[in-house]
A protein has these predicted regions:
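Exposed beta-sheet edge and beta->alpha loop/turn motif
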Residues: 24-33, 146-209
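Short hydrophobic/aromatic segments of transmembrane alpha-helices and their interfaces
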Residues: 8-9, 86, 181-182
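Core segments of small alpha/beta cavity-forming domains
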Residues: 57-132
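Juxtamembrane and targeting peptides
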Residues: 3-4, 8-10, 14-16, 20-82
Length: 209
């Protein structure tokens, strides 16, 4: 992954997401994943927080915050793959509302790249009275990957999304930054089953082959 500090100009184009870590992109792997008997150590889960904001200047009419289906709150590969997609939806909601609440509920504190991203983009924008126009994330596809147990992950998925063109507006409504649309980009997302639910423990831009 390309090395950047998370600045507001980073925002959520694919380049923004790619710029939220300092390590190399995950290499694509087309091998068939196998079930693992690996048992990671037990860690404290993320604390509960307040409900997410449901309105904002970048929220579409009638749109509600994304939710992870209760029926998929189980420890299996299919549920993990859906949760990886849900992580991207929480980031999309952050760009709709400049609220990091939903995203913060989705990852464990050890995901420092997650923390850096939501703090530098959503929290930073909100503190300055800024908001976004466009930049919304659309799901394209996902695929289960072999688990390398990175940060004691339970499962790994690659999620491909597209990102609309984005503008950042100051509190007076003036455009102060913009970024082009990204038709397609893939992220590798490591998730862990902990405390009877899923959490993100790391994410990187994936180099597909």
């Amino acid at each position: 992954m390309r090395e950047h500090r998370v600045l507001l100009l980073c925002l959520l184009t694919a380049a923004a997401l790619a710029g939220c870590t300092s390590e190399q992109p995950a290499q694509g792997d087309t091998s068939t994943p196998t079930l693992s008997t690996y048992s990671p150590p037990t860690y404290a889960t993320a604390p509960a927080s307040t409900p997410p904001i449901t309105t904002g200047p970048n929220v579409r009419p009638g749109e509600k915050p994304p939710t992870f289906p209760a029926s998929l709150n189980r420890n299996d590969r299919v549920a993990a793959d859906v949760y990886a997609k849900y992580w991207m939806q929480t980031l999309d909601w952050g760009y709709a509302t400049t609220d990091s609440t939903l995203a913060r509920q989705a990852f464990l504190p050890l995901c420092t790249d997650c923390e850096r991203f939501v703090k530098g983009n959503f929290d930073g924008a909100r503190a300055k009275g800024e908001h976004f126009r466009g930049g919304r994330v659309s799901f394209v596809s996902s695929s289960i990957q072999p688990n390398d147990h990175r940060r004691d992950s339970t499962a790994v998925s690659d999620v491909t999304v597209s990102v609309a063109a984005l503008e950042t507006l100051d509190r007076g409504g003036r455009v102060i930054a913009h970024a082009a649309a990204i038709p397609k980009i893939t992220y590798r997302i490591w998730v862990r089953w902990a405390g009877a639910r899923w959490f993100v423990v790391d994410w990187k831009e994936a180099i597909t082959q």
